[in-house]
Amino acid sequence: MKHIAIIFVTSLLASCNLFQKTQPAGESVVVEEAQKQQKEAFVPVEKELYVISHTALRYTVPDIHSDPEEAMNSFGDLFEIEAESEHFYKIKSNWDWYLRKEDMGSYEDIQFTKEVLEDVHFIGKREGDTFVDEEKGTTLSKYFTIDMISYEEYQKAKKNGYFPLVKDTLAIKKKEGILLLPCSDTVVKLKDVEMTPQDDLEVYEYEGEMQPIHQYLIAGYYYEAGDKFLIDKRTGHKTEIESHPYLSPNGKYIITLGVTEMGGATAIALYKVLSKDPFAIELVVSAWIFYWVAYEASKNRPTFFGKDGCLYVAMDALDSYEYNYKEEDKPCKYVRIKIKDRYQ
């Protein structure tokens, strides 16, 4: 009997221990579910904040355990906030949606990471009318080193900046819709064309002279498109380029920057100057930058090459640029772009 009693007690203790071991697991599930079901407590606020992270996600349910609906694709955008909770901001809108508080902040908080600076929609080279893509995953880092710099660094470089474009726009004036460009061997005639059922729109503007390489710079405007091109002052030969050109101080390279044909973020291209007489260039690479856009036409925030051979650019996140590009006194960001040695 004594042995039977001991066995019974031992079995009873084992059963109790088993119950105690399994019970917390059940309780943890209940607690976890309860936590998930806890609602965020929102309080009304009135403020504006930027999307500071390029990985920000949009939520239709303010629950950190729920799956977000989709990526925002609004890096640098400014939103009105109508309420906030511990983890979320409620965006002022006609429908309910939310952003994580960690993804929102002031303009100064916008996070231009290495990935943000270098990422592209696509990158490659035009061969005739075909664009040949680089290997998947290639970014601007293959060709350039891009660093964020301060306003003070930008201004210091600007004092010794290289500005080879002479904007003598009064020297060559359009008359009755016609631009006449005097060259050593010929006269180049560019005539505006009005939009009609038979003809597409064509408008040409003289932007100045790139004296070190003896080229006129012309802007062409067409129906839903535009371009820049060079006219040789000696031969009258036309050289097509991607967008606005910036000649390096040593005259060996041209980088072009400008908004894309679709009005998106900045297009960048690198050319090697093969010869000045006769003038010839070779496209090294062309890309559409994903997240940021240059203030290409800004008078107070010009793009230029410094004496160190780097390109200095005033820029912004695409959505910030759309707010600020008409206001020269608004703050912006600055980058320094260096051509990698293997392409020099």
Which functions belong to the PLM regions below?
Residues A14-S15:
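C-terminal motif of bacterial Sec signal peptides marking the signal peptidase cleavage site
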Residues P24-F42, K92-E134:
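Boundary regions of SH3-family modules and the immediately adjacent low-complexity/disordered segments
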Residues G26-F88, I123, P182-M195:
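Beta-loop motif signature
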Residues S106-D199:
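Solvent-exposed N-terminal domain segments of exported/luminal and surface proteins
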Residues G177-T196, Y223-E240, A269-W288, K326-Q344:
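Surface-exposed loop/turn elements that mediate protein-protein interactions on large endomembrane-trafficking
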Residues Q198-Y206, I241-N250, Y291-P302:
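Repeated scaffold domains used in trafficking and secretory/extracellular systems
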Residues E207-P212, P245-T256, P302-L311:
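Blade-terminus and WD-like Trp-Asp/Gly-His loop motifs, strongest in beta-propeller folds
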Residues I218-Y223, T256-M262, A267, V313-D319:
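Beta-strand C-termini and the immediately following turn/loop, strongest in propeller blades
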